[in-house]
Amino acid sequence: LGTLSPLFVSNYASTQVREALARLPGVGEVQMFGARDYSMRIWLRPDRMNALNITTDDIAQALREQNVQGAAGQVGTPPVFNGQQQTLTINGIGRLSDAAGFGQIVVRSGERGQLVRLSDVATIELGARSYSSGAQLNGKDSAYLGIYPTPTANALQVATAVRAELTRLHARFPADLTWEVKFDTTRFVAATIKEIGVSLALTLMAVVVVVVSLFLQSWRATLIVALAIPVSLIGTFAVLYALGYSANTLSLFAIILALTMVVDDAIVVVESVETKMAEGLDRGSATAEALRQIAGPVIATTLVLLAVFVPVAMLPGIVGELYRQFAVTLSTAVTLSSVVALTLTPALCALLLRPRPQQPAAIWRGFNRGLDTVRDGYGRLVGRMNRRPWLALAATMAAAGVVVFSFITMPKGFLPQEDQGYFFASVQLPEAASLERTEAVMAQARELLLLNPAVEDVIQVSGFNILNGTSASNGGFISVMLKDWHQRPPLEAVMEKVQGQLMGLPEATIMTFAPPTLPGLGNASGFNLRILAQAGQSPAELEQVTHQVLRTANQYPQLSRVFTTWSSNVPQLTLTVDRDQAAR
């Protein structure tokens, strides 16, 4: 901030930055936390008003009449007298802009010309419209803008556009005013896509270079199989682009799984051609004969896989939305791999394959001996099982039982909790606690958080409850940005440590929670539990039952940090007017 006041910074961000960001393509909403816009604050003096017999309605009426922006009209417009030389627009004073101007508003005029001005019955100052909330970054007053993309927007593109726009706007910023992107949810998306890209490259190397080379033992055969991968993946991305999908975590995860599938059909074709060539056929005849024999099985295996993935793309509801891109990506990759195996792979076999030598190279002999040992052992095991069918049946039933038991006993959930690089803390003071008390407690919490080596930045917003989206002087929330993933422990470990430290602040209830795995699905991870008073119980009885539920829920090892922000003990003042005295 430097020499700039928090009020100026907040108002500048609201009027000069917020609207510019809201106009960017893909931006759905720009929300300002702790906003303090400029406003003329008029503090009435009841003693002076009573002495002059002036009411609040009189003052409100004077403000409405004398602080207006309206057209004053024109002079010299037709019909006019002959000889009119000019037509002029009349400009009035319009809306008032400073405290002195508001002080000159005439509230009442007397019969002898005496005037009662607003400054005679009120104290006027330029301040904020509301002081009920505030925002700070690492203890410094700041303007906190939250930017939410539209449902169909690409979050990474929106983040890039926002940074570019802020860079452009920075040239017009006053001195001592700067901007920083401290809370960036796309950092997790970018890191995830990067990790998927690394996994994609490693999978490609492991599957093609290592596994295929080990078993095919020919660089020509390995090259033919390897060429099937980029062709299938390029075709898959083309279909995804045509359908309006993007390269996101779901589609890229499906691509990784598809890598092992797109080479299956190509390997089958190459092995079949090599077998025919070993029988004495030339490359062209071997390819044609192999294709006649395996075309049907290749198509059949593709249809079996499609029978698994296509129905997933048709699931209704939010589950269907989540898995649709995943299923479409896999189905497309499998289909294209089958097409490649029946077209490109045979053509490459006819051009590149050579008959295998009678004796494999020395580098492969050790591997072949081990493979033969495993194959012979497996054959003997199958032979024994065939002679004892009841044993095979028992083993199959036991395996099925283990699967069913695991499915029943394994914990179930909609989506796993992700380490997105940040978490929240909800601060709740006793009901009717002032904003000053709330900010003092949040300052203590901030200092504790910044001492944690895993924490990078802390943004605090007082006077706003993030869980229910309401303004309250006794509440606030803290956004805790963590350092890079490889520089700190996992999210759950950091939250557990922080939660233990924050519980040492007795003035407030502070609960940490992770963000939802999918943006837009609530404000926190986990689930909500609603308690309904169906028999007309009082708020006090409902609160008692709620706390009983909380105590019981926190005893379960599967649950942690179960809490509520609701309370029935809200202190209030009751004003009783003595109507007889007021009428005198």
What is each of the regions a protein language model found here?
Residues 1-38, 57-74, 89-130, 153, ...:
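Surface-exposed amphipathic alpha-helical segments in non-transmembrane regions
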Residues 36, 49, 81-85, 136-140:
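Flexible, glycine/serine/threonine-rich loop segments and coil->beta-strand junctions
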Residues 37-50, 144-147, 528, 571-574:
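Short glycine/threonine-rich beta-strand-turn micro-motifs
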Residues 49, 116, 123, 142-143:
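Short, isolated positions in well-ordered beta-strands
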Residues 73-86, 207:
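Interdomain boundary/hinge elements
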Residues 131-497, 501, 505-508, 513-514, ...:
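Hydrophobic regular secondary-structure detector
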